[in-house]
Amino acid sequence: MRPVSSAEEVGALLSRSDSSGRRRRSSPVQSASPRPAGCGCGGPRRQSSFRDDVGHAASETYLVTRLTFSLLQYLGLGYRWMSQLLALTIYAILLMPGFLQVGYYYFFSSQVRRSIVYGEQPRNRLDLYIPKDINRPCPVVAFVTGGAWIIGYKAWGSLLGRRLAERGIIVACIDYRNFPQGTIGDMVSDASQGISYVCNNIASYGGDPNRIYLVGQSAGAHIAACALIEQAVKESSGQSISWSVTQIKAYFGLSGGYNMHSLVDHFHERGLNRSIFFSIMEGEESLSRYSPEIVVKQSSSQTIALLPPIVLMHGTEDYSIPSSARFLLMPSADVHLR
């Protein structure tokens, strides 16, 4: 089986889900996301001077450097870690020509709205990829990138954003705090807040608020699934919410893992030490809490009924997260595996 995470197949699945999907019932929500000033299909442009951009870049560079040294304290300088770092460096060098093309598009294209603020934390930013010509409200993808919970960044979704924007789909790439800046609870909270911003504000950028699809890849698939299920639990129990699960037309999980207990040994063998993984997941005792497969089995029928159709895709030759980890068993839920 070949991987099915290409922009073409995601776009096709979105169209299929849109044409055959059931009507979602709406739910009143209490908006907690700031709404952008202005309106119009093109959406408000982020007003910033060159000085502001330089200052923002400098602060992010300092933050990344500081967190890198903090991370090295966790990782140590073992042979396995160093060998994998060397392999990753060589891999990045070989892909540099492609990176340069994507980087040029990311920084200079008028279709990209970079670093839109959705919350108060330093990494609470998202990028929007807008189609050139918007004649009517566009379908929307809220994308949570992967990165082993450590190196995720919103720009990793730039190629997906570009390809889907060419097909008339608005893409919102949501950034979130990585470890050691934050743990899994912070990541899920950030992702949920980013989704809230998309649900409450995307119409101002030409998006259709009734056609929002949540997509996560690798660690991002795990984080997005946690955010979705956590929101369903809150909504079914009558808690105050800033966005409704019923606003999500479908969830697509690409190469994700949904039972953290089953992945501890695998990650350890791949170089992610158990102690580091437990620190990311807020302790071994929290693995069940952040395992979507376990949470849904313990959830009420009211919670399950709120969840949108779910499509899980995984390549059988994926060694980062084994394809067996894709099984997210949900009684009475609309789940498709590919």
From Swiss-Prot:
GO terms for cellular component: endoplasmic reticulum membrane; Golgi membrane. Substrate binds at residues 146-148, 217-219. The active site is at 218, 318. GO terms for molecular function: prenylcysteine methylesterase activity. Its EC number is 3.1.1.n2. It catalyses: [protein]-C-terminal S-[(2E,6E)-farnesyl]-L-cysteine methyl ester + H2O = [protein]-C-terminal S-[(2E,6E)-farnesyl]-L-cysteine + methanol + H(+). It is an enzyme of class 3 (hydrolase). Keywords: Endoplasmic reticulum, Golgi apparatus, Hydrolase, Membrane, Transmembrane, Transmembrane helix. SUPFAM superfamilies: alpha/beta-Hydrolases (SSF53474). Catalyzes the demethylation of isoprenylcysteine methylesters. This is Probable isoprenylcysteine alpha-carbonyl methylesterase ICMEL2. The lineage of its organism: Eukaryota, Viridiplantae, Streptophyta, Embryophyta, Tracheophyta.
